[in-house]
Amino acid sequence: MEKSWFNLLFSKGELEYRGELSKAMDRFAPIEKTTISKDRFIYDMDQNFYAWGERSSYYNNVDLLVSSKDIRNFISDETFFVRDSNKNRYSIYFDRKKKKFEINNDLSDLEFFFYSYCSSSYLNNRSKSDNDPHYDPYIKDTKYKCNNHINSCIDSYFRSHICINSNFLSNSNNSNESYIYNFICSESGKIRESKNDKIRTNRHRSNLMSSKNLDITKNNNQLWIQCDNCYGLMYKKAEMNVCEDCGHYLKMTSSERIELLIDPGTWNPMDEDMVSADPIKFHSKEEPYKNRINSFQKKTGLTDAVQTGTGQLNGIPVALGVMDFQFMGGSMGSVVGEKITRLIEYATNQRLPLILVCSSGGARMQEGSLSLMQMAKISSVLCDYQSSKKLFYISILTSPTTGGVTASFGMLGDIIIAEPYAYIAFAGKRVIEQTLKKAVPEGSQAAESLLRKGLLDAIVPRNTLKGVVSELCQLHAFFPLNKNSLK
């Protein structure tokens, strides 16, 4: 008999075989495991997970979820110790050969669900069919029936007993369901899908790649966006550049992130006229540095790779800097460093909370050592802001955040938040592999891996990011100017 511990979470959709969400504030018990297949499950033996919450509401963090369609693959003479959202523990014992299903005495009503299904006419009268997509010629029909209805009774029980009703951090009444169901990811940061799902996705992809749909995307690129993972079309503003089909996080421009975080009509930009003057006269055979700067300025409408300014976040005055990867890969040159430095100095003088949203490929090589100097310059003013003035700095890492930004202000936040699936590293995967002649483990530079190693404080989806940052500011005594503006 094998025994396994796992945290149980259930939303109003089908249980998904995915991985973990994130950590936040309230301590949740660790996950333990004795023996189970490594290929079937994702687990972490040493990790404590956390959850955002208020007095009567909470979010669970999940290290292990099992799909209902995969249940027949693991219910062979195993006892599972289950911990529900209220931290109550109980056991479920399956014996597929003897068709036994046992629950401890505290959950006798779950047994009632199971035996009700087993005695139903549907179970007794169901016949085998070659057209049944679930039919497996190598598994006896009786075993399939037993497994199917074990899953059904568990499904019914948890639907009726486990619910999460908090509307914290979101304006939507269904925020928790979407938070839990849509943002559960695997350890590698990619959504797992079954063989049938892949076939369906490929067919769907071929349809979406038709000339008609591509024309729609080109003609309405301000309204619609195409996922670069599954090629599905989505309404840009409503979905926050997150694919509703596969959960893939697409890049956002700095203007889109400002719109996401800052209250309408409160944004006041700073140093918009600051432009790089090619300080080291960088020579390039392909394209002069000045010409390249001009082309990106026309393409993005920005003067350089960062926007800085002040505004209100749910009524709270903040100083905000947002890097834009579309401008030369978000590289940090003298202008980027100077604008961020001036923003921090302004926040220090005005005693404002500081938020920096990072998305960068690192220091800008066209400016040589001047770009590297920005790392020390920004870190120096941050030291005064944090250590001397005791003010609050939140660093938000998006994909990708690498190089000099990671090595300086990106990882200096009092609170370091990352988006799901974000690629965060100092040296890129290709550079490491070429230097060390060793393969970099898949997912080792993903936000989820860094969270487990303690390099991040939380992984927060876009739809809850504004609420999380607002709550953090209030915890550090930064309150809205108008209490009615707090949502």
Swiss-Prot record:
Entry cofactors? Zn(2+)
**What's an example GO BP annotation here?**
malonyl-CoA biosynthetic process
Any idea what this protein is called?
A: Acetyl-coenzyme A carboxylase carboxyl transferase subunit beta, chloroplastic
Q: What is its EC number?
A: 2.1.3.15
Spell out the SUPFAM superfamilies in the cross-references: ClpP/crotonase
Q: Give, as residue ranges, the zinc fingers classified C4-type.
A: 227-246
**Domain CoA carboxyltransferase N-terminal: residue ranges:** 223-487
Q: Which organism is it from?
A: Lobularia maritima (Sweet alyssum)
- Cofactor: binding details: Binds 1 zinc ion per subunit.
What keywords are assigned to this protein?
ATP-binding, Chloroplast, Fatty acid biosynthesis, Fatty acid metabolism, Lipid biosynthesis, Lipid metabolism, Metal-binding, Nucleotide-binding, Plastid, Transferase, Zinc, Zinc-finger
Q: Where does Zn(2+) bind?
A: 227, 230, 243, 246
For this record, the Gene Ontology CC terms, alphabetical, are: acetyl-CoA carboxylase complex; chloroplast stroma
Instruction: Show the GO MF annotations.
Output: acetyl-CoA carboxylase activity; ATP binding; carboxyl- or carbamoyltransferase activity; zinc ion binding
